[in-house]
A protein has these predicted regions:
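Catalytic cores of eukaryotic secretory-pathway lumenal/extracellular enzymes that build
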Residues: 183-184, 198-199, 206, 238-241, ...
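Hydrophobic targeting/anchoring helices
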Residues: 20-127
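Catalytic beta-strand/loop cores that center a nucleophilic Ser/Cys/Thr
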Residues: 127, 134, 231, 261-385
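Bacterial N-terminal signal peptides that target proteins for export
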Residues: 1-8
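Extracellular ligand-binding/catalytic regions of CAZymes and related secreted enzymes
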Residues: 21-63, 243, 341-422
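Alpha-helical scaffolding within the catalytic cores
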Residues: 97-102, 146-148, 357-361
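Helical hinge/lid and interdomain linker segments adjacent to catalytic or ligand-binding clefts
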Residues: 20-23, 28-32, 62-72, 122-230, ...
Length: 422
């Protein structure tokens, strides 16, 4: 690794033309591959090259010191780059610094260490985050219950949760898939893992994992969750010491008054929701706006949500999380597709919504020293991803606005913002 860094520094010093001081990676409509552009930013950070994220400038562009190796790698990956002189970079920063424009520059200084919470066994659906990180060539580690309970989370900066059920109800797939081989094997594996780690029920293990994740965020970690993970995580926290699992999930009936015993103060984002007590219903709670309700008024052709616009100079965190080359994003479904506004705590910040339908799609908040971000839906380029569908081929969607939201979150932990003078 030291040899790699020294070699790269030699490139940085020796291969920099006097007239070409910076590389600009535009993130507007001129960019050929938005997704791999994030990978180039990460690639530079890995080699200790500082990256400046130009918020709201040409779609949230990246700028860094010129190196022949960086330009060559960018072009090799199909990423559009512009070689600019020192004077041009100064002019860009001057334009951004103007108090009358809604732009800002944020320094990215260190490549975040990334963990994805996912079982080692193969389940019949894809994970949008691992798909896009693999496509963008951003490295990550896979961790699951054994590693989390062993205490590895504090060694990471960023943790992703996707299609996971932290309530111990196996994704509420019992109604449709209880006789499927993959479901039978998943239940068997989950139960064996719980017993191995000293728990009598899967729900007890998952709650312990939730507490480890909570402590990770409290200590300064960055949590990003999609699909069923956001609501199942908060439901599990609210249901601490409450049995919300019916007999087919844990061998005994749920508590008759389980709903009344929920403690919403333990949740990150949600409140006042009702849990689903029907074991055959493919829903965890009323946090999600269920598909049957949505499909009365919405379909693939008219399903969109809008990113909020924030003050880049003062609200730089939500501004980073909403960088895009369009403010209108095509919707996509999941076990949890959209969050009901009346179940969202006032402390949570809404990043995107479909106002007409009253749907919140993208949420952010703080917990302790860290932050969490929740995004509804399963796969931004597969409108209704079914069990058994093949993974999305991202080479067909190199400019996906929905996948850009995921990648914004991956670079977010690398940011260091200068304090404004008052």
């Amino acid at each position: 690794m030291l040899k790699l860094k020294l070699t790269f520094l030699l490139f940085l010093v020796a291969a920099m033309p006097a007239w070409a001081s910076y590389l600009l990676i535009p993130m507007d409509e001129t960019q050929r591959n938005h997704l791999k552009a994030y990978g180039i930013a990460y690639y530079a950070l890995q080699r200790e090259v500082e990256v400046t994220w130009l918020l709201n400038y040409r779609g949230g562009s990246f700028m860094m010191k010129y190196a022949d190796a960086l330009e060559r790698e960018s072009r090799l990956r199909g990423v559009t780059v512009e070689v600019i002189a020192d004077g041009q970079s100064t002019a860009i920063l001057s334009e951004i610094a103007d108090a009358s424009v809604n732009m800002d520059a944020v320094r990215l200084q260190k490549a975040p260490k990334i963990a994805v919470y996912s079982p080692k066994t193969k389940l019949p659906w894809d994970d949008a985050v691992t798909l896009v990180m693999t496509y963008a060539e951003i490295p990550y580690d896979v961790v699951y219950d054994e590693e989390v309970m062993a205490g590895v989370l504090p060694t990471y900066d960023w943790l992703h949760l996707h299609h996971e059920d932290f309530t111990g109800q196996y994704g509420k797939f019992w109604g449709n898939y209880r006789n499927a081989q993959w479901y039978i094997e998943d239940v068997r594996d989950q139960e064996a893992r719980a017993h191995k780690l000293g728990f009598s029920k899967v729900s007890q293990l998952k709650l312990a994992v939730c507490h480890k994740i909570r402590d990770f965020v409290m200590g300064g970690g960055f949590l990003f969750a999609m699909c069923s993970a956001p609501d199942s995580y908060d439901v599990a926290l609210a249901a601490e010491n409450v049995d919300i699992c019916d007999v087919m999930f844990d061998g005994d009936p749920m508590q008759p008054n389980a709903q009344e015993l929920l403690d919403f103060s333990k949740c990150f984002a949600f409140k006042d929701f009702r849990i689903s007590t029907n074991p055959a219903e493919y829903e965890i709670s009323t946090i999600d706006i269920d598909d049957r309700s949505r499909m009365k008024t919405i379909n693939e052709k008219n399903d969109f949500f809008t990113l909020f616009e924030f003050s880049a100079k003062w609200d730089w965190v939500p501004t980073m999380l909403t960088q895009n080359h369009t403010r209108i994003i095509h919707g996509f479904m999941g076990q949890t597709t959209a969050f009901r506004r009346n179940t969202i705590k006032s402390s949570a910040l809404v990043l995107a919504e479909n106002k007409e339908l009253g749907e919140v799609r993208y949420l952010h908040g703080e917990y302790g020293k860290g932050t969490w971000t929740f995004l509804g839906g399963h796969d931004p380029e597969d409108y209704r991803h079914f069990v058994g569908d093949p993974p999305t081929d991202l080479s067909l969607y190199p400019n996906s606005p929905g996948y850009r939201l995921i990648l914004n979150n991956i670079l977010f932990p690398a940011a260091k913002k200068e304090k404004h003078k008052t």
